[in-house]
From Swiss-Prot:
EC number: 7.4.2.11
Chain's gene name: metN
Species: Photobacterium profundum (strain SS9)
Role played: Part of the ABC transporter complex MetNIQ involved in methionine import. Responsible for energy coupling to the transport system.
Protein known as: Methionine import ATP-binding protein MetN
Gene3D superfamilies given in the database record: 3.30.70.260, P-loop containing nucleotide triphosphate hydrolases
């Protein structure tokens, strides 16, 4: 449905070239909810703006529904964009227009009749749960309601693709979840392809079936969400996964922690369990086999894309040799172990 083929985007500040995107290749199938995640400045918003050519790639091709947008004339591109809806972080509603009038705007610009506009807008407002807000102005809506209006407006032209640029970043957690639920419902009912840009792994976890991770303008990893969570190949992927299960080192431990082992100190480790290692009784096995005591400071587990994953902070009490053997045993059983320091 969407092919992003060897896309590069270069911005210039005077004579200085800034590579915002470098050789990006992605294929997004029809009906997929596809997430692109990255930190601020990673290039993800530039990428989504390239998909409908709000930003024209410096090189490469954007193919949507079999049509290479980079080869179209301005008139042809304008027509093609009608099949690509887009919503933004800050809604971009017209304050002087009511909810009904905001949603009707694309239809008015396309020359639809008044009867056709009313029928279409009424149906869209019902779909997004705002049938009772026809005559309300944006200033009297909550953030979540404004985003629902923006979604309805984006769907007015019956697009095949919906682009979401940080669509939940300005919303509180409960409202974010309601918008994600709405997007999932729209995807299911309309078989709509959704490309979603975010810096929040929780959003990807909550709605996406496929994900790509971008860092410094480059594609770092891509694949099914469950596979990325279960088998992250890069530190950037692990960083985003950890952000969904935030296990902070207690303050008193930080004060007593040293980077190197000293007399009377014991290793503080972070364990990342994915796939089969989540269900295996590895902690009890380690304690028995290596005669070591394990003090679990905190742990958390989640389930996504058919895969369990979890994090744990633990302190190992025993001889130095036993601790090293225990860590080696865990790593042999596909547990990622990081020694954070030593606590006296």
């Amino acid at each position: 449905m969407i092919e992003i083929n060897r896309v590069n985007k270069v911005f210039y500040q005077g004579e200085r070239a800034i590579n915002a995107l470098s050789d990006i290749n992605l294929t997004i199938e029809q009906g997929t909810i596809f997430g692109v995640i990255g930190s601020s400045g990673a290039g993800k918003s530039t990428l989504i703006r390239c998909v409908n050519l709000l930003e024209r790639p410096t090189s490469g091709h954007i193919i949507v529904d079999g049509v290479d947008l980079t080869q179209l004339s301005n008139k042809e591109l304008s027509l093609a964009r009608r099949k690509i809806g887009m919503i933004f972080q800050h809604f971009n509603l017209l304050s002087s227009r009511t909810v009904f009038e905001n949603v009707a705007l694309p239809l008015e610009l396309a020359g639809a009749s008044n009867n056709a506009i009313k029928e279409k807008v009424d149906g869209l407002l019902k779909l997004v749960g705002l049938s009772d807000k026809n005559d309300t102005y944006p200033c009297n809506l909550s953030g979540g309601q404004k985003q629902r209006v923006a979604i309805a407006r984006a769907l007015a032209s019956d697009p095949k693709v919906l682009l979401c640029d940080e669509a939940t970043s300005a919303l509180d957690p409960a409202t974010t979840q309601s918008i994600l639920d709405l997007l999932r419902e729209i995807n299911r009912e309309l078989n709509l392809t959704i490309l979603l840009i975010t810096h929040e792994m929780d959003v990807v976890k909550g709605i996406c079936s496929q994900v790509a991770i971008i860092g410094d303008g480059e594609l770092v990893e891509k694949g099914p969400v469950g596979d990325i969570f279960a088998h992250p190949k890069t530190e950037l992927a692990r960083k985003f996964i950890r952000s969904t299960l935030d296990l902070s080192i207690p303050t008193d431990f930080q004060a007593r922690m040293t980077p190197e082992k000293v007399t009377g100190s014991y290793p503080l480790i972070r364990l990342e369990f994915t796939g089969a290692s989540v269900n295996a009784p590895l902690i009890s096995q380690v304690a028995r086999e290596f005669n070591i005591d394990i003090s679990i400071l905190s742990s958390d587990m989640d389930y996504i894309g058919g895969v369990k994953f979890g994090l744990m902070l633990a302190e190992l009490f025993g001889t130095e040799q036993a601790a090293e053997q225990a860590i080696a045993f865990l790593r042999d059983h596909k547990v990622n172990v990081e020694v954070l320091g030593y606590v006296a």
